[in-house]
Amino acid sequence: MPLLQPSTCFCYPLKLPPLPLTSDSNEFDECARKRLTLDYRTGSAVTLTRSNIFVHGGLTIPLNLPVVNSMQLQKELILFFAKEKNNGSSFRNLNEWISKETFFLDLMSRTWYRVKTSFDQRTEELLKAESSSAKADNDTNEIRTDIKKGKSLESPLKERLFHSLCYLDGCLYIFGGLTVSPQSGYELIATNELWKLDLNTKKWSLLSDDPQIARRFNHTMHVKNENNDNRDTKLIIVGGLNNMDQPVKKIDIYNISQNCWQSETIPKQPMEITTNVNGIPLALSKDQNFSILVENNEANVPALAFYMRSDQIDEYLGKDSSKIKENSPIVALPLLSESQGIRMPSNPALPKKLLNVPYELLAPTGDYFGFNIIIGGFHPNYQSSNFHCFIYDINSGKWSRVATACPDCDINKHRFWRVFVWKSHHQTILLGTKTDDYYSPSVQRFDHLSTFGLPLVNIFNKTIQLPHHKISASSLPIPIENFAKHKDTPLKKVSFTSSATSQFENYIRYIAPPLEMSSIQSVFPPYAMVLGKDALEIYGKPLSDFEFITSEGDSIGIPCYLLRKRWGRYFDMLLSQSYTKVCADYETTDTQSTLIKFSPHSSRNSSKAVRQEGRLSSSGSLDNYFEKNFPIFARTSVSEAQNTQPQVANADAKAPNTPSTSDEPSSSSSSDLYSTPHYQRNNDEEDDEDPVSPKPVSKSNSIYRPIRKTESSSTTSSSNGMIFRVPFKEKAAVTSNTEALLESNLSLQELSRRRSSLMSIPSGELLRSSISEAEHQRRASHPLTSSPLFEDSGTPCGKQLQQLQQHTIQNPHNHLSPRRFSRSARSSISYVSSSSDRRGNSISSRSTSDSFGTPPVLGVLNVPLPPQTREPNEPPPPCPAMSTGSNTRRSNTLTDYMHSNKASPFSSRRSSHIGRRSSTPETENAFSATPRASLDGQMLGKSLKEGSTSQYTQPRMNSFPKANETIQTPTSSNNEWSRQSVTSNTDSFDSLQSNFALELEPLLTPRSLYMPWPTSTVRAFAEFFYTGQVNSKWLLAPVALDLLVMAKIYEIPLLYKLILEVLYSILAKKEESLSLICTSLMETFRTKTLNSYKGDEEKTNTYLTSNDNYQELLKLKVSLENIDNGYYDPDLLRKQSRAQSSSTQESSGSANGEKTATGAGSLETSSTNVPTVFAGGPRDSHNSVGSIGFPNSMNIQGSRRSTSGFSPRVKMKSSLSKEIDPKTFYEEYEPKEGKSFDDNDDQQTNIGSFNLHLFDMNYGSISSSSTNSISSSDLEEKEEQEQLQDLLEIEREDSAEILDARFRNKEDDKVTKDISNDKKRNYLPHEKNNLKAKEGKETRDVREEEEEFDFGLGMLSLNKIKREAKHVDKVDDSVDPLFKSSAFPQSPIRAYGSTTRTSSASGKPFRDNRSFNAFSVLTLENMASANALPPVDYVIKSIYRTTVLVNDIRLMVRCMDCIELSKNLRALKKKTMEDISKLKGISKPSP
């Protein structure tokens, strides 16, 4: 079998729910223990909603069921109890072995919890009343009577298995299933009861037990119109078996809005729908088929899509299943009365051996995402190694296989049994067990999951169907008016707000038009995106209380609350670090402000007995913080349900991955505290663990409290009310009103139980060390370096931003003159408007106007200023030796990082801080060795190193430790099992369960964050938090490519996946164009050959078989098919490996003087080339926030002067702007015959920045290091110009033929006749000479192309960037019709063209002019929309270089394959043209 492309899977262990705490540990027998835990289940109902997976019911014993029916189940039960001697002897009733418990998995914390439920009082009374007058012949009443005879506290909800479960608006619904017969304790019967569990009240209620509805089990249930308020919401019940094990083919529909079955609705709208294909009924069962409900399809008619093995469908249809399968196993069934199912098309181009597997999957499961169906199953048997995952593209019928191997699969053999699609996070989840237990998929395990991202689905969207099959991509839901096309059910009564709603819908379409660049819907619904855009563009300034400072010195405002909510833990870390430092400085100076009520000593002394023992939750939010600490301002939410037992919540809240003194929380606390984190608050953005996910449209009234109250709680000071706009004190150390914040007395035992995730520690805990016993030993001018959270960073931001390099080694006292730096250079978080500079030293001369542009008002506020501190006069201590381990910021090499699990987008907060080593000043050891001051050592699991050096002398060049060298401590191990969440961008304000109020003092809260990126990129970064989507107007470069790196470094997995989705779309267009060109070229070659041989098929086939070029085209086409099917192409991979190996051997003499890559992603980089973001920021400041989150294994300390690859446009503030000035660039390469550019301010960002940034702008290093000077030397410039000139001469002489070939199609004979006899006679010898000349240059040419891949972190010379920017179209014009507007009249690129092509004979002026104008508008819309043209090769190379930085192996390989195929096709096209010319010569003399 071919080798699959790289897997993007990562596995995570799940913490199973513990037994409830009881006074008697022996109270639970074996049956009860199994019911209350999730070790094994058979026939439980499982569903995923939002960020939770719910499980209900099921047998608690593992049963291998080849087929699910009541007879087989009874047989397996008898065999099981016969084998189990102990169980067999003690067996009394089958109910003991069936669970009725409800569990849910919090995907963010990866922890299972049990929901403690009760029974609805009204329903219970109704049941008792009915039971008292029950008739003997009524089965349901018999069941109720039996229940009445039992325990009074027992819920009437019977234990069941093989039932269905779904979620809607904060409620769980279950239907049907098998229950134990009341007549016998071992017989199972089907039921038709429909139950509802309200997750707000945790009470069950019986909705229906209508005897007219068929009893069934082993079926599925779907929710229809969940997000449409204008239509009734319904439950669609599909498939299953009845009591006689006969299939139920009728689809039952329950109308939730009217609380009745569809046959009883008013007005009557019966719907008779049966599962069928072409009118022939089909039997669906959950164990052999799966079904999904697709509402947003092209026809605007909700339809079921179900999977059934192709041979089974053929049996129903009476076809011979031995024949080659031409239809996929996917059947679409519209939900209309008497509708007929249709088999979905399948791509016939796939070979039969690849179709056997997806057509014959066993135990299939799946879901849909965008216009793709993700399917998982087993073939040919149930062995765990035979689990396969496929993506079926609805548009093209394409099947593509996805690798599911994870980094841990070599150690543990996993068994997965269920596939989920986590749509809000664009991920697929595989649920199963870590170690293969050799059970069949009918045995359900819940201790392990694996995830892989879904943006890759866009790469499979090859448009093979006819035009009428094409589905237009839209981010908008189905227009309401389109629902009237089918008479499913009447629309609800029009309300008085319908006109306003209609106007708002029109406004939505105007403000947030449908995106054409993606087949996947946006994260947020349209109205949410509109609100976000309005907040950004209209109310951005009034709402903003925080700002991003860009590398160009611009300020971009954004609300701090929004960042905490949607950026999450990473931002919390930055904020807490800086806030802690400010508070510590305020305390150190011992100067009290009239605006700040802060008494750390008294509050500390009075808090010893107040703080209750608390444990950290796995997730949290600002909402939960308000709910617990400020209930007056809180929203009605889950916490109100928890307030009934606040002491339980505080005592039993537990970190999911942290051992504690009490191993298991009580059932009441676990259920009350964790059972409803997301779904109780139905119609607001409350999803703590899901910061940017779509919210279901609620059908109830709003449960918000007045929003102004919520604002007041977060924006008011403890003294003078709302003072967000008040600038901060500059000299006086400042802090928050932490009287309540400090009311915690953490014991060492308590600390030892805390997890070491950075984001789980609120600033209240961070401040503990700043008030330690040794606080009076600090010098007033000495920065706080023992903050418990940031031992490795020294100061909250100033030291944190020194992760990789420090500029103080060249000027140890430059902190005394902060004016030497520009505003943006000093605008890192906490030091824009705090009491110290970026180095952490106090400054009295700087005012707030530096960061806000407003006049200082400190005098007006009468804030007392302390006396200026003395300048330090002691000399800096000497630099430590290179081998000193304690000063190594990161412990692993780049190569180690590239192959580490921590490189994944799902990497949690902790993984990016494991294994770090810090530079801790000697003064720190004096007090951080004390028990209270060593909070960091206990929380972060780091041990202080002796002999560490002063903060002023950390060397810029750190040693390179051995690969995989890490710091192993009891609480910090370099493995993946300690991760806190699947995705790490979780807001974490609720990470400390306690009863003391924690309020940030607005005067002390940092308000600016320096980001070493261009303004356009940072603006887009901020826009994402407002809208939750990718803007189609963003430039591919620098914005989109920068955002990919930012999302990885700053840990925003959703943004990472959205950008990847766009990049995959661009790559898919390139591959599709290569496939079309290859097919067209082969058909043209065959047609011309057939014509030359007068239609003789035999001679034609013989000639083509012996023609090397045609055979190469065949191989290239096969390669494209293999890659598109999800497999490696062995030949292509072998060629690339050889090329990379030869390049590696020659790398010592390469132009850029760096070690080169070997293989896909095997990077080793020289220490001389460090991109700015790694080095810590532009302008050699090395203190930027860009270096904060880069993975800990990247120990790439470099030379003293940094490269500027990550901040290419710095307004005359670095050497880079002198080397690359946009105006200079235009002047040198401005088209002579075209329209010149205007250098106004508007074009400076949009058009002007393009030439600087399009291809390598972020990563094309223009190094000022002496070791890199060779790459921009005059010698290389001259050599490159000579090579380029030779290449252009060859290209120019053949330009007419090449351009004509681009317009050629297989029916076009006129183009072939254009090659005259003279041209033919001169062409071959001349081409021969040209080819000889090319061979002379081929070595250097190949070397150039190799160097474009063999680089350290994407660094190319300036010459190469200029050359490619100017001449890329000439290199690619034989295969890339990027500027051929005449052939694509619908292309959006035409709108930006300033010239039109008037002559086809000479295309050079046209292409030159078009290139600059077209490139300058390379927005995502123009690159990835449905009408976009294929990108040129250099765009793919740029994506590849960016992908190397983020270590996305799969995309890396696809880009390399695509570029290699494009290069091969370009060469083959020229050779094929030569062969066609020869054929003309053969056919001419023939009679």
UniProtKB/Swiss-Prot annotation:
Residue positions, PTM Phosphothreonine: T785, T930
InterPro entries in alphabetical order: Beta-prop_ATRN-MKLN-like (IPR056737), Kelch-typ_b-propeller (IPR015915)
Entry GO MF terms: peroxidase activity
GO cellular component, one term: cytosol
Signal sequence bounds: none
Compartments, as annotated in UniProt: Cytoplasm
Keyword match Cytoplasm: yes
Entry-annotated residues carrying Phosphoserine: 472, 475, 621, 639, 693, 698, 744, 747, 756-757, 781, 787, 900, 904, 1187
UniProt superkingdom: Eukaryota
Keyword set, alphabetical order: Cytoplasm, Kelch repeat, Meiosis, Phosphoprotein, Repeat, Sporulation
Keyword Cytoplasm attributed: yes
Compositionally biased tracts (Polar residues): 639-648, 883-895, 946-957, 965-986, 1189-1206
Job description of the protein: Negatively regulates early sporulation-specific genes. Seems to exert its function by positively regulating the Ras/cAMP pathway. Required for growth under alkaline conditions. Acts synergetically with PMD1.
Name of the molecule in the record: Negative regulator of sporulation MDS3
Organism: Saccharomyces cerevisiae (strain ATCC 204508 / S288c) (Baker's yeast)
Protein encoded by which gene: MDS3
